[in-house]
């Protein structure tokens, strides 16, 4: 009854947002065997997850999520793209130059609270430094400030290893960063990230504990702003999905379905929220159909509007978007149990 009341309130607050829930997303990982490698799982994630907490700018720009971090968790999301920047001496989460309404510390507190409530689960936090708003002094502080924030959560931060198992991670956060941080030996650093349509099969994830290194195959082609590029994005997502299907159990896959299909007046970095919605409306059904026709492991799949099947319109688009964000989260989770 409590969960029904929570979702009723959420729907009343967001009348243009439709949320579908076919299972209990709070603790779906309880059904996973402890011996399974995390690299071999199918895990739904949220691209620029903190934008669901609100942004300090007109929401027509840079907003990639409708749900809060807690609500993303509740619908089954377990990978969170968080991009902290040092402002003064504190960490705030940004998307490019756009500041969200939540600090990095508060975001970690929310995830730690969820893990305390649901100790069978684990979370993955993908990080990168969002340096657009930092000055040179703040950039120099980023590695140590992030390391201190992770160190502050103690053993809630997991020790990364290439073939780490579900049982190793329950109740913990796995930190995987695209920028090096210092002062903490938990988590891991990515090298070789690519934004090309082809992605890469030769990136690496290296543990800060013992330098053990995993191979990473990934795709993050984020600006499919015309028809040709949109087709390339579709092919890139499906190619990365195909690679995940045949990957060894200790090879990690990160597949960003996210992207924006139009820009404000043709310029970057002002990617419009409606551009992200339009991309989700096109890409998500393609992946859902692929997984329906041929179930397979997916790796970590980063989504826009995770948990929302329908969202409101935006700049130059007044009608609602069918973003299929709840259906695709359910579909990804379901691949673990085929």
Regions found by a protein language model. Name each.
Residues 1-21:
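Bacterial Sec-dependent N-terminal signal peptides
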Residues 83, 125, 175, 301:
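Conserved, mostly hydrophobic/aromatic
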Residues 21-75, 88-117, 122, 183, ...:
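Long, acidic (Asp/Glu-rich), low-complexity accessory segments flanking structured domains
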Residues 152-295:
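Surface-exposed substrate-engagement region within the catalytic domains
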Residues 84-87, 127-130, 178-180, 306:
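An acidic- and aromatic-residue-enriched active-site/binding cleft used to recognize and process polar
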Residues 76-86:
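Active-site beta-strand/loop microenvironment that shapes enzyme catalytic pockets
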Residues 119-134:
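Active-site groove signature of glycoside hydrolases
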Residues 90-104, 132-153, 165-166, 170-173, ...:
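Active-site periphery "cap/insert" segments of enzyme catalytic domains
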